[in-house]
């Protein structure tokens, strides 16, 4: 089965073709990062317009790369949510229009299920069951995974997501958008002993997260230093180091608890923040101590992409899922509401 995947949930236009026999055979991505950088964040209307401009050329590109015609595909999978409603509509309407033209099914896919299963595209994918840490700009969740559509939410952020906290900390430190990679890069030069930031919600039982207080602590620290004069480059680096260590430590503590609570030995880490080198280093050490193993997507599949959508669509269709009767665009869509494929 050959499935075209379309991802347009936010600020990246991703298109890919996944073959259930050959694996990923074509993949293309257009990032809107430079366009949104001057505004310090994603502008929804601009995102939708850019998806409209870029989506069809990317579809043509992956078809050419795979040496296929549209009518040689077996299905189209598209991100139906969660995400920006206008951006979702671009992908959904394009998918349904092409599916009708090529007389093939179109299936809406949950964006976070795509991230959750992105490590399945790697050469050594994890077996079920596993614990998953989904950590991105919009989500921070721990999920117990027993199969496709068999998910149990263990914990989630009660306020800001980890990726959102990184972006806000970057603004406080006058770093460019998107903030996460810039904070991590700056943190490498920071003194780990100068500041110690709190590890929110780690002093009590449970698997929920909170990052808003950490954001406030970062702002307070920066303002205290500014009272004596402008922040130096070393001040910024030291704050970035303390912030990153606090976020990473919090995520590691909660993952450790989740593995202990479930008794599972496999940990999947996915979403944009999963690319953070310090987080991977700490989680690799933590899982090794427990005779467990951590799994990650390759770098380009940590962020939004069409490959993960094509993969999930293919798996659901193979398992008997039927195509959408109507176009779907669902800005808010809890992952825990998903169910196994039903024929």
Curated annotation (Swiss-Prot):
Entry note: cofactor: Binds 1 Fe(2+) ion per subunit.
The keyword Acyltransferase is annotated on this UniProt entry: yes
Cofactor: Fe(2+)
UniProtKB keywords: Acyltransferase, Cytoplasm, Iron, Metal-binding, Transferase, tRNA processing
EC number: 2.3.1.234
Subcellular location: Cytoplasm
GO function term, MF aspect, one: iron ion binding
Residues involved in substrate binding: 134-138, 167, 180, 276
Coiled coil: none
UniProt GO cellular component terms: cytoplasm
Residues at which Fe cation binds: 111, 115, 304
Leading EC class: transferase
A biological process from GO: tRNA threonylcarbamoyladenosine modification
Catalysed reactions, semicolon-separated: L-threonylcarbamoyladenylate + adenosine(37) in tRNA = N(6)-L-threonylcarbamoyladenosine(37) in tRNA + AMP + H(+)
Gene3D superfamilies documented for this protein: 3.30.420.40
Role: Required for the formation of a threonylcarbamoyl group on adenosine at position 37 (t(6)A37) in tRNAs that read codons beginning with adenine. Is involved in the transfer of the threonylcarbamoyl moiety of threonylcarbamoyl-AMP (TC-AMP) to the N6 group of A37, together with TsaE and TsaB. TsaD likely plays a direct catalytic role in this reaction.
Family: Belongs to the KAE1 / TsaD family.
Protein name from the UniProt record: tRNA N6-adenosine threonylcarbamoyltransferase
Record organism: Chromohalobacter salexigens (strain ATCC BAA-138 / DSM 3043 / CIP 106854 / NCIMB 13768 / 1H11)
Gene label: tsaD
């Amino acid at each position: 089965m050959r499935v075209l995947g379309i991802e347009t949930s936010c600020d990246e236009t991703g298109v890919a073709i996944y073959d259930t026999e050959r694996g990923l055979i074509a993949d293309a991505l257009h990032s809107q990062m430079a366009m949104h950088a001057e505004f310090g964040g994603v502008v929804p209307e601009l995102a939708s317009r850019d998806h409209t401009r870029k989506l069809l050329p990317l579809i043509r590109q992956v078809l050419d790369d795979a040496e296929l015609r549209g009518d040689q595909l077996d299905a189209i999978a598209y991100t139906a949510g969660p995400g920006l409603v206008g951006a979702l509509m671009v992908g959904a309407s394009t998918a349904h229009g092409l599916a009708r033209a090529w007389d093939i099914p179109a299936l809406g896919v949950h964006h976070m299920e795509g991230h959750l299963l992105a490590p399945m595209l790697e050469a050594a994918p994890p077996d079920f069951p596993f614990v998953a840490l989904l950590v991105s700009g919009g989500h921070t969740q721990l999920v117990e995974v027993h199969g496709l559509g068999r998910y149990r939410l263990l914990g989630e952020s009660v306020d800001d997501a980890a990726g959102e906290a990184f972006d806000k900390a970057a603004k406080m430190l006058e770093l460019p958008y998107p903030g996460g990679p810039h904070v991590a890069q700056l943190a490498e030069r920071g003194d780990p002993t100068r500041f110690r930031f709190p590890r929110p919600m780690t002093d009590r039982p449970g698997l929920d997260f909170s990052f808003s207080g950490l954001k406030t602590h970062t702002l307070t620290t920066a303002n205290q230093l500014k009272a004596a004069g402008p922040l130096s480059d070393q001040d910024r680096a030291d704050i970035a180091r303390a912030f990153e260590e606090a976020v990473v430590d919090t995520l590691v503590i909660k993952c450790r608890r989740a593995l202990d609570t479930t008794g599972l030995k496999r940990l999947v880490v996915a979403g944009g923040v999963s690319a953070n080198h310090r987080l991977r280093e700490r989680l690799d050490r933590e899982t090794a101590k427990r005779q467990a193993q951590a799994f990650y997507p390759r770098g380009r599949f940590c962020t939004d992409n069409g490959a993960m959508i094509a993969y999930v669509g293919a798996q659901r269709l193979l398992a008997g899922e039927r195509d959408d009767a109507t176009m779907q665009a669902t800005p808010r869509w809890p992952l825990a509401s998903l169910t196994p494929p039903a024929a």
